[in-house]
Amino acid sequence: MKNLKDKVVQGIRKGPEEPKAKSYRKSHVPFRLNFLFFIIFALFVSLIVQLGYLQIVNGDNIEQQLKASSVVEVKGSAPRGMIYDASGKALVENQANAAITFTRGNKMTAQDLLETAKKLSELIEMPVDKNLSDRDLKDFWLADEDNLEKATERLSDEERSLGTSEQYTATVEKVTEEEINFSDAELEAATIFKRMNSAQSLSTVFIKTSDVSDQELAVVAENMIDLPGISTGTDWTRKIVEGSSLASLIGTVTSEEQGIPEEVLDEFLEKGYARNDRVGRSYLEQQYEEVLQGTKSISEISLDNNNNIESQKETFAGAKGDNLVLTLDAEFQAKVDKILQDNFQKLIDSGAAEYSPGVYAVALNPKTGGVLSMSGYHHDTGSNEMQENAIGTFINSFVPGSVVKAGTLAAGWENGVLNGNEVLLDQPIRIGSDVKASIFNPTGANNRNLSAEQSLEVSSNSYMMQVALRLMGINYQSGISIPTVDRQGDVYEKLRSSFASFGMGTETGIDLPGEATGISTSIENMDPVSDGGKILDLAFGQFDTYTTLQLAQYAATVANGGKRLQPHIVDGIYDNDETGGLGSLIEDIEPTVLNEVGLSDAQMQIIQNGFYDAVHGTDAWATAKGLASAKMEVSAKTGTAETPIVDSNGNTISLVNLNIVAYGPSSDADIAIAIVMPQLKGDTDTHPNIQIAKEIMDAYYDLYMK
């Protein structure tokens, strides 16, 4: 009770509690919400600004990027430039052909190609590729997914573990001969498939380029929706228009299937070529590839979301390559061809050319180095026929004979062992038991004094050998001995250096690939003792070999007074007119002086006088009198080289190379020529080299100097 009473009293004393004032806490929710709204607003404004920037400022760029993701540019071929002769006649042109093409999509499978190839083969006449290999046929068979699965089941466990490429190779080996024994219709489809399969992703190849009919073009166009990647277009083929002898000089162009030759593939790829581009593979077409190559056409290919081709549109038709105008005239070239053919055929018919490998002639302009004609014919031993071989004028070399003797005189003058028009006694040169002599003085019964000029007129071997001996420090006396080969090196060098200054034994610089420089045997490859006399043979043209072009450059160098000009077959590079024909000049090929012969005017005059006297001199032994009746005044130097052979029975047959170099008119030459007729029977007395030279000079006169 007491406790209860105390609590009551205590409660009465405190009295009732007054109510406390109600306490309110400030809420943070509205602030956070407002801040969030502000951030959203700011982002929204930023988005609007960015969209505006993209749409207004950078809209074109964005549009291009979007387009680029769905549109791909593909390049196609363009016609090569044409080749014309000096008169403007087309020698090589492009023949346009309707074509059926294929552009490979990004995701096209072998099965896709197979289905398209089969459909297309039913719509067009497709010639079967004669070069279809077993591998091509097996690839065609395996393109069918069911066949691929069937062949894959034949793999061993070990073969299944191989990488993708190796496993496919193993699968190919499992295809049987019976499975690739196709019908003609299937072979047509296989041909189409092979060409389609050669295309890289988003590249275009030609399926059919010849004999495409209007009906085939129409039916392909009608069915394009069912032929993914197939289209129609235009292709070109290279056609030589005039002059069969120019075909080899012009060269060839690879096909699309051949593409870029392996040996120059990397070089061309770096220049932006594609692997299957058609390029020049020989001679003019190769030398002037970058000039003749056209600018490729450009097409836009639209892709759908699955990277399949939706459409294809040409945006740039391409541009034909630039054109070449040559220095030679097809009409003069044809005349030279006929002159060689007619004269050499007579030698074949008479048996004189039985062992001859052919006949070659080159004509140059000695004022510019321009090639006026290059003609050659190859002949097989015992044959009654000949084949065009103009390239033999600069890739085949022969022993020249006495035509080189101006080079020997030059070596004597340049090395201080010969004085001006010095007189030497023509006599047989006896080295030990060996005897070498001039044709007109084989035994010494016709010993006579000759000046340097006369030595050219009558073609003195003795004079030239004495110059060579002087280069060794020897004044000739009968029965002397000469140094062994290993001590003659500087003499070979001196003679060959002088020869090279005229163009013999060195590159002429012709604007054609594959030029030969002839054969110059080094002293390291000679017998020190038995070959000791070869240096004398070199002095009168019986040792080293030269091309017909080198001899023509030599003749031109004598004709113009000592300037060795670089020969060139291209006179200028031209663009195209509106019709694709010959346009205006882009680049003129100017004369290039490679070197000047190190002779004085007086020394060069002695050489020119000697060449003139060989034709017009009064000496009974003047070697080229047959040219005196030419329609223009001609200077010349003949050459006869002994080139015996041993036949299959072991018999030695005496043969000679009959050669000549000439130029005219003598006082101001417009043409310089070289003619080489190797390995004719030694009993040839008709001087066919002189006859051919006369006919060529007369043909030039009739065409350009009348």
Question: Predicted segment positions?
Answer:
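Short N-terminal helix-loop-first-beta-strand/juxtamembrane motif that initiates sensory/input modules
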Residues: 80-83, 227-231, 349-364
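Short, basic/aromatic recognition patches
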Residues: 63-76, 332-354
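Beta-lactam-recognizing serine transpeptidase/beta-lactamase-like catalytic domain environment
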Residues: 90-93, 98, 302-317, 328, ...
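Active-site His/Glu-centered metal-binding helix of metallohydrolases
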Residues: 52, 403, 407
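A short acidic/glycine-rich loop-to-helix N-cap element
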Residues: 678-692
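Membrane-proximal periplasmic segments of bacterial cell-envelope enzymes
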Residues: 1-290, 296-310, 316, 468-472, ...
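Gly/Ser-rich catalytic serine loop of serine hydrolases
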Residues: 80, 394-404, 543
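Solvent-exposed, polar/charged alpha-helical surfaces in well-ordered, non-transmembrane soluble domains
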Residues: 111-122, 218, 222, 247, ...
